[in-house]
Amino acid sequence: MTALAAGIAMLAGLGVGIGIGIATGKASESIGRQPEAFGRIFPLFLIGAALAEAVAIYSLVIAFMLISKI
């Protein structure tokens, strides 16, 4: 049962992957349309990607905690 709970906790990784993929596509599209805006777009993209990855890391930690039954 704990393996199922850990698997459900890791579903957040699916959402993170989709979200970062969409954000990367939109950032690339924006930079392609306005290359001079690279300095404004890229840092915001990195901050957003880092925040999204934090969710994935938290869900991984929760999954490990569930498996080890802490």
Swiss-Prot record:
This is ATP synthase subunit c. Keywords: ATP synthesis, Cell membrane, CF(0), Hydrogen ion transport, Ion transport, Lipid-binding, Membrane, Transmembrane, Transmembrane helix, Transport. Pfam families: ATP-synt_C (PF00137). Coiled coil: none annotated. The lineage of its organism: Bacteria, Bacillati, Bacillota, Bacillota incertae sedis, Caldicellulosiruptorales. The record marks E53 as: Reversibly protonated during proton transport. GO terms for molecular function: lipid binding; proton-transporting ATP synthase activity, rotational mechanism. The gene is atpE. It is a multi-pass membrane protein. F(1)F(0) ATP synthase produces ATP from ADP in the presence of a proton or sodium gradient. F-type ATPases consist of two structural domains, F(1) containing the extramembraneous catalytic core and F(0) containing the membrane proton channel, linked together by a central stalk and a peripheral stalk. During catalysis, ATP synthesis in the catalytic domain of F(1) is coupled via a rotary mechanism of the central stalk subunits to proton translocation. HAMAP family: ATP_synth_c_bact (MF_01396). InterPro entries: ATP_synth_csu_bac/chlpt, ATP_synth_F0_csu, ATP_synth_F0_csu_DDCD_BS, ATP_synth_F0_csu_sf, ATPase_proteolipid_c-like_dom, F/V-ATP_Csub_sf. The chain crosses the membrane at residues 3-23, 44-64. It is found in: Cell membrane. GO terms for cellular component: plasma membrane; proton-transporting ATP synthase complex; proton-transporting two-sector ATPase complex, proton-transporting domain. F-type ATPases have 2 components, F(1) - the catalytic core - and F(0) - the membrane proton channel. F(1) has five subunits: alpha(3), beta(3), gamma(1), delta(1), epsilon(1). F(0) has three main subunits: a(1), b(2) and c(10-14). The alpha and beta chains form an alternating ring which encloses part of the gamma chain. F(1) is attached to F(0) by a central stalk formed by the gamma and epsilon chains, while a peripheral stalk is formed by the delta and b chains. Belongs to the ATPase C chain family.
